[in-house]
Amino acid sequence: MKIRIAARGSKLSLKQVEIVTTYLQAKGYETEFIEIKTKADLFGNKPLHEIGKGVFEKEVNEAVLQGRADIAVHSMKDMSSELPPGLELLATPKRENPVDVLVSELNLEELPEKSRIGTGSLRRANFLKVVRPDLVVENIRGNVDTRLRKYRDHEYDGIILAEAGLRRLGVEVKRFPLDVESFTPEPNQGIIAVVGSPKFLGLFQELNDTGTMKEALAEKETVKVVGGGCHSPLGVLFRLEDDVLHGIASYSNGVKRVTVKLSTRESPQIAGNQLGKALVKAMKDEGLIP
């Protein structure tokens, strides 16, 4: 039997597809890759938060719903909160390191005033403005290779990227991890999602990492409570340790940042809900929302 896999054609997306392909081929399945060009790929210079929620996801899922592919593979951070009817989250392989990193010759404290920092993320831009308001935040788009080329061509003094993407691509570049309190990662950063018909649930059982799935569901629940998609200035991270979910959520308008934390043995849905409600309360208390 052949399984057709829909995904974007970027180098990072292909690395993620490779993980799923290797798993399926080891189980004796043939695989076929269906490349999908999304609206976000076509509007390469626009900031991501201006294009809209679920922008990398919609067309890829449509290929499955229309029968052109059997499953879709996504960076889970690019997915909107709800999947369309007929599709389910089938598996989340083990999560890669979820932190943000500063690619630069100098760490964040050492960078001189007015250093130009490139990011295409409103969340990263706002968090950076709180920590180092004296730096110049500039929009950057393109895949990881393009961003690194622009950095190496001295268009920027530093760029902020996800550690997970650099690791999956095997990129060796000087970089500094950013602490999760000041730069709480994007919800589901470092997680790959396999999406498709519920009939495939059994097939992907062994690929699924239950700890990663719990973290993913808790983070999604927080996003649902707070509102805002993958391009809002919201950071959420859960880590599962000894059956305890440890969560942190942060929101910033570029002037103030609020951060809340919790640890609980409750289900991912309850944990995410509680963290989301705590963040909304903190945002109201600080006057970030009415």
Curated annotation (Swiss-Prot):
<dbReference type="InterPro" id="IPR036803">
    <property type="entry name" value="Porphobilinogen_deaminase_C_sf"/>
</dbReference>
<protein>
    <recommendedName>
        <fullName>Probable porphobilinogen deaminase</fullName>
        <ecNumber>2.5.1.61</ecNumber>
    </recommendedName>
</protein>
<dbReference type="InterPro" id="IPR022417">
    <property type="entry name" value="Porphobilin_deaminase_N"/>
</dbReference>
<dbReference type="InterPro" id="IPR022419">
    <property type="entry name" value="Porphobilin_deaminase_cofac_BS"/>
</dbReference>
<keyword id="KW-0627">Porphyrin biosynthesis</keyword>
<comment type="pathway">
    <text>Porphyrin-containing compound metabolism; protoporphyrin-IX biosynthesis; coproporphyrinogen-III from 5-aminolevulinate: step 2/4.</text>
</comment>
<dbReference type="GO" id="GO:0004418">
    <property type="term" value="F:hydroxymethylbilane synthase activity"/>
</dbReference>
<comment type="similarity">
    <text>Belongs to the HMBS family.</text>
</comment>
<feature type="modified residue" description="S-(dipyrrolylmethanemethyl)cysteine">
    <location>
        <position position="230"/>
    </location>
</feature>
<comment type="function">
    <text>Tetrapolymerization of the monopyrrole PBG into the hydroxymethylbilane pre-uroporphyrinogen in several discrete steps.</text>
</comment>
<dbReference type="InterPro" id="IPR000860">
    <property type="entry name" value="HemC"/>
</dbReference>
<keyword id="KW-0808">Transferase</keyword>
<dbReference type="GO" id="GO:0005737">
    <property type="term" value="C:cytoplasm"/>
</dbReference>
<dbReference type="GO" id="GO:0006782">
    <property type="term" value="P:protoporphyrinogen IX biosynthetic process"/>
</dbReference>
<dbReference type="Pfam" id="PF01379">
    <property type="entry name" value="Porphobil_deam"/>
</dbReference>
